[in-house]
Curated annotation (Swiss-Prot):
It holds the Pfam family KOW. InterPro entries: KOW, Rib_uL2_dom2, Ribosomal_eL14, Ribosomal_eL14_arc, Translation_prot_SH3-like_sf. GO terms for molecular function: RNA binding; structural constituent of ribosome. The keyword Ribonucleoprotein applies. This is Large ribosomal subunit protein eL14. CDD domains: eL14. Signal peptide: none annotated. It comes from Methanococcus maripaludis (strain C5 / ATCC BAA-1333). GO terms for biological process: ribosomal large subunit biogenesis; translation.
Amino acid sequence: MAAIEVGRVCIKTLGREAGNTCVIVEVLDKNFVVIDGSVKRRRCNLKHFEPTDKKVDLEKAASTEEVKLALDAAGLL
């Protein structure tokens, strides 16, 4: 399993945004992170997404525009 870290690209597996690509922008604690990307920026339980082996270069708490630019540059959006 890939590490849970800022910049890790993930796929949502549960909820209304299931199947969409997202990126971890902040780690809150051992159970929750903040995600953004092709999903609405929100807090998300670790059980609701699957991390991939891909990672984009982002700083902690990056803006939505920075996240979308990084995903677009990596060809993931």
